[in-house]
Amino acid sequence: MAVGKNKRVSKGKKGGKKKIVDPFLKKEWYTLKAPVMFHVRNFGQTLVSKTQGTKLATDGLRGRIYEVSLADLNADEDQSYRKIKLCCEDIQGRNCLTNFHGTSVTRDKLCSLIRKNYSLIEAFTDVKTTDGYTLRMFCIGYTKRRPGQLKSTCYIRSSRTRVVRRKMIEVMQREASTTSMREVVKKIIPESIGKEIEKACKSVFPLQNVLIRKIKVLKKPKFDLTKLMEVHTDISEETGHATKVEESEEAANLLTKELDAQEA
């Protein structure tokens, strides 16, 4: 009988089955901390690969940009039309300290403002804040009917449009160049810059729905940990005030006795 290979017996594959490793075992979670300007400080968590050799986990986190709705940061649904960008600048323990990196308005909000028979006016300018940030601010506004107007349309002439645009740029530069980044963000949340533009342009042509459409951070100053900690620490107004400590009656009586003894 000839000895040969049995063709019916199938060979097993080389290496066999590989073990399925869960990729999340090599990763860890970090908490995201928002600056003091917002009410909700812990706004989420982020995932990063664990430190392996010379590759540190913190290096993978620095510079990450997170886009969050202002409604989530301030716990107010009325502010859901604005999006805030926060950039991770430093890591302390398992906390990622973020700072403001820009803002924009949602598309559905912009589409809801567009109306028939009204003019749209836009302007933008580059501003440098007192703490060294260079911002590019975009403003948008719409014409408004004058009281008692009978005409159905509310269009603006190109000559007046140029004047309104000039006033928009002046207000944006005045409001942002004289304050720090922290104060600029505080002005954007309640739309106070838009209200100032409406007041300034009232004499030229009445405007409505004026708001800062977008802010881009073009240039940042050199990283300083102390300045970042100032943004993340809430300094109460009461610090630094002198407090008057009332003396007890016994202490006052002892003092008068000593003075009487010295005089005698």
Swiss-Prot record:
GO BP terms, alphabetized: translation
Keyword vocabulary terms for this entry: Cytoplasm, Ribonucleoprotein, Ribosomal protein
GO cellular component, one term: cytosolic small ribosomal subunit
Subunit composition and interactions: Component of the small ribosomal subunit. Mature ribosomes consist of a small (40S) and a large (60S) subunit. The 40S subunit contains about 33 different proteins and 1 molecule of RNA (18S). The 60S subunit contains about 49 different proteins and 3 molecules of RNA (25S, 5.8S and 5S).
Protein name: Small ribosomal subunit protein eS1
Organism name: Babesia bovis
Lineage: superkingdom: Eukaryota
Gene Ontology MF: a single term: structural constituent of ribosome
Family as reported in the entry's similarity comment: Belongs to the eukaryotic ribosomal protein eS1 family.
InterPro entries: Ribosomal_eS1, Ribosomal_eS1_CS, Ribosomal_eS1_euk
Keyword Ribosomal protein carried by entry: yes
Cellular localisation: Cytoplasm
Keyword Cytoplasm belongs to the record: yes
